[in-house]
């Protein structure tokens, strides 16, 4: 008689869903007010001119224009700005 014993249990087999973080609009791209520029955890990028910061640190455009990434300040922080054309 062919019998199959019970399979052993495992503690693996689960993973969290990806959060789709990162830069959504790159330098030189044209954006409209309200467009999301960066989704991030913490302030990897800081808001510059015409850019707002949401409670989850999402950066978004507050006016129409072109996206500009720049590094400035004594701590070499990365800033995202929207320059009006």
From Swiss-Prot:
One of its GO terms (molecular function) is structural constituent of ribosome. InterPro entries: Ribosomal_bL27, Ribosomal_bL27_CS. It comes from Thioalkalivibrio sulfidiphilus (strain HL-EbGR7). Keywords: Ribonucleoprotein, Ribosomal protein. Belongs to the bacterial ribosomal protein bL27 family. The gene is rpmA. Residues 1-23 are annotated as: Disordered. GO terms for cellular component: cytosolic large ribosomal subunit. One of its GO terms (biological process) is translation. PANTHER family: LARGE RIBOSOMAL SUBUNIT PROTEIN BL27M (PTHR15893:SF0), RIBOSOMAL PROTEIN L27 (PTHR15893). PROSITE patterns: RIBOSOMAL_L27 (PS00831). This is Large ribosomal subunit protein bL27.
């Amino acid at each position: 008689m062919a019998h199959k014993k019970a399979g052993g249990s495992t503690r693996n087999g689960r993973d969290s869903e990806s959060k789709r973080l990162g830069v959504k609009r790159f330098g030189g791209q044209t954006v409209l007010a309200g467009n999301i520029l960066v989704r991030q955890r913490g302030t990897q990028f800081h808001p510059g001119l015409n850019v707002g910061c949401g409670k989850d640190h999402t950066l978004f455009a507050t006016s129409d224009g072109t996206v500009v990434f720049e590094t400035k300040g004594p701590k070499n922080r990365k800033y995202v700005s929207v320059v009006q054309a």
